[in-house]
């Protein structure tokens, strides 16, 4: 079965099963004009707590890049006593993996002061994503289009606050903000940007606004023969998505212009084409705008008016940096904090001093990992060219468990 058919089935099933007595969506309590919702910011992703059918609160990523609400574990869905109407097969983002899931219609997803009514949830039979390993904290699912579709939502990355507005009281552009058009296609928001490439040429690109992607700019080279790779690129693991890890190269673009914002020397990902590429091409988009760029701004997403409001945030002028060590870290699925080397870039500073894939990190700069967040170590490893970082590791060699110290000098490679 082709990717198009999988997507059609998904969209049809998710929205054909809701009764007509309730309109699916998220709604403020009566007489409330706006609601501030705090969120956790990990790797610039937005993590909020919500309950399903009066359960204890669990962690969700707020993600404009998906239409369906997702729960990553059927085990958790069973514990929540969810009703499942049928099974479904999905194609993963790598274009190869086939994922099985169950459809649970007509649920309540509640945040204090905000009610998610008649919500359909796609429950994965297995946790194919493993965001716990990537972020180092439990993440149970994703809330997508339904959260945004009726009401303007402001995201303040500086204060880690979401403001959910009643649409009738949000009638004009707020002071200090500018706006551009943001058309919705299949429940997903798109804006136009202009990139300046290595040969000096400029190219207008259609970008998916994706708060659930922790990269900066991603460009799909298969969508246009006018997209050029930068002169210097690194092969890299580009991250984890529904259906597996994505690979490709990263480099720097000299500039991205969005409205009156200009982002300079930005890190840009160029994923390898997959069987899923046909779906991307059909949307007409050339890439994705992720949270490493969005988090440098304050934005208001107004789906009903199809407007993207923006202003500079406190981190706007912070330089874009990529990992300078060569280490991609993951967390082990244990109660105590345990981090290991998931991937090692060949020829990188860590590779040159003898770090290996599978090594477990037990301390960084003399501080045990119990006192580190995974995202804080990742930020350290891309912080400053020439910075020295000492890591203590445990390595299994046959029946022998060795403790080693490695001194890494960070080097900017792009």
Predicted stretch roles:
Residues 20-414:
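Pepsin/retropepsin-fold aspartyl endopeptidases
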């Amino acid at each position: 079965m082709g990717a198009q058919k999988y997507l059609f089935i998904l969209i049809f099933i998710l929205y054909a099963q809701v009764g007509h007595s309730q309109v699916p969506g998220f709604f403020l309590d009566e007489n409330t004009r706006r609601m501030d919702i705090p969120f956790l910011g990990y790797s610039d992703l937005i993590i909020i707590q919500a309950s399903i059918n009066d359960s204890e609160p669990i962690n969700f990523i707020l993600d404009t890049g998906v239409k369906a609400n997702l729960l990553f574990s059927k085990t958790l869905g069973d514990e929540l006593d969810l009703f499942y109407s049928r099974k479904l097969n999905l194609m993963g983002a790598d274009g190869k993996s086939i994922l099985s899931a169950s459809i649970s219609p007509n649920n309540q997803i509640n945040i204090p002061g905000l009610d998610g009514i008649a919500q359909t949830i796609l429950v994965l039979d297995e946790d194919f994503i493993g965001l716990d390993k990537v972020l180092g904290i439990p993440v149970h699912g994703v809330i997508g289009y339904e959260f945004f579709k009726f009401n303007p939502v402001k995201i303040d990355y500086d204060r880690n606050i979401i403001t959910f507005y009643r649409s009738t009281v949000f009638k004009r552009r707020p002071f200090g903000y500018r706006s551009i058009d943001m058309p919705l296609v299949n429940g997903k928001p798109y804006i136009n940007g202009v990139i300046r490439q290595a040969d000096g040429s400029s190219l207008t690109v259609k970008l998916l606004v994706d708060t659930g992607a922790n990269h900066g700019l991603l460009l799909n080279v298969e969508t246009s023969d006018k997209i050029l790779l930068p002169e210097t690129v690194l092969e890299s693991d580009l991250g984890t998505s529904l259906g597996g890890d994505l690979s490709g190269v990263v480099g720097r673009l000299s500039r991205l212009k969005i409205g009156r914002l200009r982002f300079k020397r930005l890190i840009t990902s160029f994923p390898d084409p997959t069987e899923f590429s046909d779906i991307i091409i059909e949307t007409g988009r050339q890439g994705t705008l992720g949270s490493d760029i969005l988090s440098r701004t304050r934005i208001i997403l107004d789906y009903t008016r199809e407007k993207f409001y923006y202003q500079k945030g406190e981190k706007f002028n912070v330089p874009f940096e990529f990992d300078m060590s060569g280490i991609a870290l993951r967390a082990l699925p244990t109660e105590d904090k345990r981090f290991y080397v998931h991937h090692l870039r060949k020829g990188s500073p860590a590779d040159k001093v003898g770090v290996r894939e599978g090594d477990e990190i037990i301390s960084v700069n003399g501080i045990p990992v119990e006192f580190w967040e995974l995202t804080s170590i990742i930020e350290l490893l891309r912080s400053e060219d020439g910075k020295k970082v000492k890591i203590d590791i445990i390595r299994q060699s046959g029946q022998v468990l060795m403790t080693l110290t490695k001194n890494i000098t960070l080097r900017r490679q792009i």
